[in-house]
Amino acid sequence: IFPIFSIFFGIVFLKEKFNRNKIFAIILVFVSILYLILQYKVLPWIGLTVALSFSIYGLIRKKINIDSSIALLIETLLLCPFAIIAFLFLMKLNLNIFSFSEVKLSFYLLWAGPMTLIPLYLYTKGLQLVGIGPASMIFFATPTSQFLLGTLVYGETVDAHRLISFIIVWAAVFIYLNEIRKE
């Protein structure tokens, strides 16, 4: 859902150029999402909220002409007080899981920062180099790898509706990326 919002924002707010095939690919993804919503009769509120908020973030980052490193530093400094308040609140409720008594958990927590920061930095660098639409296409990789991992490795069953949606989305991604390659 996120790449669709980002591409839409690129067209509307950044005046990015899209030919007929790219627009067709966008419509295919939208149809795929709409198909799943109609089949399951559930609106994915969480997915829509996350996708919309991250698309707005990408749009703002694309519009503001600041180096990625400096912008991430500013964002981190702005969010730091909220993180400290949340941390103190958890400590007050005795929900402090941030103790260093368990080595494995401490290792995971220490690496959570870089594992979040590095992809975010690379994404914002990509926004500076290309349009918001092409930069957002990488976000089809995560649900695809989760889908393949779930079905091929963990043996999860996939109903026909999800399979149809998956095929439509990847046909759209192929069309879109093929158009980018031609440019």
Ranges and model annotations:
Residues I4-L52, K62-I66, F166-E183:
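Juxtamembrane helix-loop boundary signature in multi-pass membrane transporters
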Residues V12-L14, I64, A71, G126, ...:
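Hydrophobic/aromatic residues within transmembrane alpha-helices
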Residues Q39-L95:
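Transmembrane alpha-helical segments that form core, pore/gating elements
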Residues R20, L72, L77-L109, L117-V130, ...:
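Membrane-interface interhelical linkers
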Residues V31-L34, L38-Q39, F89-Y108, T151-A160:
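Membrane-interface helix termini and inter-helical loops of multi-pass transporters
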Residues I1-I4, S68-L78, L117-L152:
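Helix-helix packing/entry segments at the starts of transmembrane helices
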Residues P3-F8, A51, S55, I84, ...:
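Hydrophobic/small/kink-forming positions within alpha-helical transmembrane segments
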Residues F140, T144-E183:
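C-terminal-most transmembrane helix of multi-pass membrane proteins
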